[in-house]
């Protein structure tokens, strides 16, 4: 009888906590846990914001993983991965604290506030340093993105004496794939430019900006809570300065591990424990 009640509850409210389920049916949390885990074979999954892969993506993810793992270890520290992300003035929901009871990993999305003040931040990351931040005042397009690459990244951030040893990655966002942008980057980085044909689409689980940098920054920049966008920028810059070289090296070791897992998953999504 109690088991049936719990089955109905978790079916209707899959995000129900053990404590609330126990209170609803009048039993102990320990009893509920054993029913969920041992009898119903459920697990408390974290929310993951995954991009649904298309059929052609699997091969591209495999190809990239094999390419990366064939590189000499000494070149890994010379790979620069880049990305943009919105930072909202209001503290976002922390999905790390959310769980859903399920027999398999669910696909769940959450939304950011619709009209909240926000800034668009560009950063790049290597095993040695974080490049940026650079702030786009409006949405990014091929023109202001190329201007950023030329006037900020190239002239002020990336020392020209060093650039020939670096690989440069960007994802397939429309401003990145514009012909003018692709041509300029190929001219600067030559065969070390990881272009739109080489980088697998819908693969934030491979980009260190996505699987480390943005999440880390967003967990730190709201303490203290910013009152203005300038406060938020100052917090972002403060936290970037705190990131140690050791953390960056571990992040790129994680990058390598993820490539190995993608091969094991035959190009599919990977679950990092």
Predicted regions and their residues:
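Surface/interface recognition patches
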Residues: 1-273
């Amino acid at each position: 009888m109690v088991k049936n009640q719990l089955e109905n509850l978790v079916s209707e409210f899959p995000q129900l906590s053990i404590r609330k389920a126990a209170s609803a049916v009048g039993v102990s949390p320990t009893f509920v846990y054993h029913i969920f885990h041992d009898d119903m074979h459920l697990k408390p999954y974290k929310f993951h914001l995954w991009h649904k892969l298309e059929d052609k993506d699997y091969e591209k993810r495999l190809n990239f993983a094999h390419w990366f793992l064939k590189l000499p270890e000494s070149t890994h520290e010379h790979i620069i991965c880049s990305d943009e992300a919105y930072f909202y003035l209001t503290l976002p929901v922390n999905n790390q604290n959310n769980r859903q009871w399920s027999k398999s990993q669910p696909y769940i999305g959450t939304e950011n506030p619709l009209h909240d003040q926000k800034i668009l931040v560009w950063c790049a990351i290597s095993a040695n340093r974080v490049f940026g931040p650079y702030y786009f005042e409006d949405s990014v397009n091929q023109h202001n993105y190329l201007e950023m690459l030329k006037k900020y990244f190239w002239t002020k951030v990336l020392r020209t004496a060093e650039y020939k040893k670096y690989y440069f990655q960007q994802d397939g966002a429309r401003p990145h794939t514009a012909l003018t942008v692709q041509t300029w980057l190929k001219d600067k980085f030559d065969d070390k430019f990881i272009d739109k044909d080489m980088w697998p689409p819908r693969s934030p689980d491979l980009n260190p900006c996505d699987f480390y940098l943005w999440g880390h920054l967003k967990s730190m920049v709201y303490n203290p809570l910013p009152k203005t966008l300038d406060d938020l920028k100052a917090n972002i810059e403060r936290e970037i300065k705190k990131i140690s070289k050791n953390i960056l090296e571990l992040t790129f070791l994680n990058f390598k591990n993820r490539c190995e897992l993608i091969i094991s998953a035959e190009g599919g999504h990977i679950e990092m424990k």
